Amino acid sequence: MKKQLIIGTRSSPLALWQAEFTKAELSRHFPELDITLKLVKTTGDVLLDSPLSKIGDMGLFTKDIEKHLIAKEIDLAVHSLKDVPTSTPEGLIITSFTEREDTRDVIISKGGAKLADLPLNAKVATSSLRRMSQLKSLRPDFEICDIRGNLNTRFKKFDEGEFDAMMLAYAGVFRLNFSDRISEILPHEIMLPAVGQGALGIETRVDDEQTREIVRILNHSNTEYCCKAERALLRHLQGGCQIPIGAYASFKNGTLKLLAFVGSVDGTVGINNEITRSGLTSPDQAEEAGIALAEELLKQGADKILSEIRKTR
């Protein structure tokens, strides 16, 4: 058994929360372990003057940490799973999917107004094409404004009065104790989350069996089934932060239900579908369900939507 572990993480407040949470959970199970954090600045932390969708680079928040993992300078990397590309570098693997927080998105607004009550032509801040597409389909009048930076930075920009509202993931807002700022939690019926939203992905080297065995204690089986289904769907659609794709899977008593959405950036075209599979006994079967739903979306015309978006990116 190893005596020491080094966790690689970004230095944002939310990333540090996630790394400290992982450290505390591992220490609870393995009190003899000496666990330290190594902070890594990523491309996504540096390039803050462009929308994520325009940068055109997969793994903006992960690949720099993965370089340290491959070089054996750290033993594991802790990521927001929604930031992790669906294909990991050779020699690396997502070993654990931690139990998921609430996957929904939230509205933070002036005066606590709900989405339906925001004024005509309201300025709504989000850096996500997925949110933009679904928002514009609900309210074509909204002016969508790009916003980058960590959660604290976004709240500062919002409080300075630049926007009428902004959209964030509930999980991050809750984890950093901003829950009292939430105006509305949006149901999946109107806003499907990002693939993997609310879960942490703990990445290790494939050949580091000792670390993998230690980290596997944090894996949450239901979350693994759900996230592998969602990630398989996204992989099959060849999507990322440049494509408006939302998905949400639930898994109970061997039955997986997966909802998915593909839309145009302007919200004028959107395709929704779902799949239910029963009797699942392995995460591989959940991935098969994700691929099957992706195929259905492509048959419905998702390929045309995605092709048009890629022409402009």
UniProtKB/Swiss-Prot annotation:
Record-linked HAMAP family: Porphobil_deam
GO biological process terms on file: chlorophyll biosynthetic process; protoporphyrinogen IX biosynthetic process
Keyword Transferase attached: yes
SUPFAM superfamilies registered for this protein in UniProt: Periplasmic binding protein-like II, Porphobilinogen deaminase (hydroxymethylbilane synthase), C-terminal domain
Cofactor binding remark: Binds 1 dipyrromethane group covalently.
CDD domains xref list: PBP2_EcHMBS_like (cd13646)
Obligatory cofactor(s): dipyrromethane
Enzyme Commission (EC) number: 2.5.1.61
Pathway where it operates: Porphyrin-containing compound metabolism; protoporphyrin-IX biosynthesis; coproporphyrinogen-III from 5-aminolevulinate: step 2/4; Porphyrin-containing compound metabolism; chlorophyll biosynthesis
Name of the protein this chain belongs to: Porphobilinogen deaminase
Miscellaneous field: The porphobilinogen subunits are added to the dipyrromethane group.
Keywords (A to Z) from UniProt: Chlorophyll biosynthesis, Porphyrin biosynthesis, Transferase
Listed NCBIfam families: hemC (TIGR00212)
GO molecular function (one): hydroxymethylbilane synthase activity
Keyword Transferase recorded: yes
GO cellular component, one term: cytoplasm
Free-text function comment from the UniProt entry: Tetrapolymerization of the monopyrrole PBG into the hydroxymethylbilane pre-uroporphyrinogen in several discrete steps.
Reactions catalysed: 4 porphobilinogen + H2O = hydroxymethylbilane + 4 NH4(+)
Location of S-(dipyrrolylmethanemethyl)cysteine modifications: 241
Description of how the protein assembles with itself and partners: Monomer.
